[in-house]
Amino acid sequence: MNRTNKDLFEQYALMGKALSNSNRLEIMSLLIQAPKTVENIAKETELTVANASKHLQTLLKAHLVKNRKYKNYIYYEVFDENIEKLLTLFFETAQEQLTKANAIIESFAQPSEEEYILSIEDLEEKMQKNEIVLVDVRPSEEYLTAHIPGAISMPVQELEKRIASLPKDKEVVAYCRGPHCLMSEEAIMILEKHGRQAVRFSQSVNDWNLHHVAI
């Protein structure tokens, strides 16, 4: 193998190494939703600002993220659409493998016996028939960045106060950042507590977009 190829593989390894850390993977899972400041990232990941900044510098060097200044803040975002697709596929594949192993996921979020898997095709069919109301329970800035068409923005922290505005004659489908995110699980608990029929859509906006690019 020539030197050029070795150099390329060293660059590939740099990217792989940058992702071989649970904190950095969590940061990337946030950034594929919307650009965020170091302070936002630190708060959502429960890291110190200094530690979050250090992880972001590693991701910058690996060309996985980029930053831009807006007013007095520096925002970090996924480097480009290809990195977003790569991460979406990675999280989706990892989730499938973990589900097959039936170990970590059970300790992370135990589904109810009544829960069923709602596919993208199922969701589209229900939306076309006007059978459901789709609720995006992520923070509002993530909804504004990208959301599933037809979804209503209702952050999980606001859900209980706004639940009366949801139609009572329709099933509520809640989604958040994907299978690793528990905000939609919390939303289902709140909805069911108020006597609403609700189900979780475990896939993300990125999964939705990737599905429609593929067909």
List each model region and its residues.
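Conserved catalytic core of two-component sensor histidine kinases
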Residues: S53-K54, E185
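Amphipathic alpha-helical dimerization/coiled-coil segments
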Residues: N2-E10, T88-N130, D136
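Catalytic cysteine-centered active loop of the rhodanese-like fold, especially the PTP/DSP P-loop
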Residues: L64, L166-N209
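Beta-hairpin "wing" of winged helix-turn-helix
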Residues: K61-Y70, E77
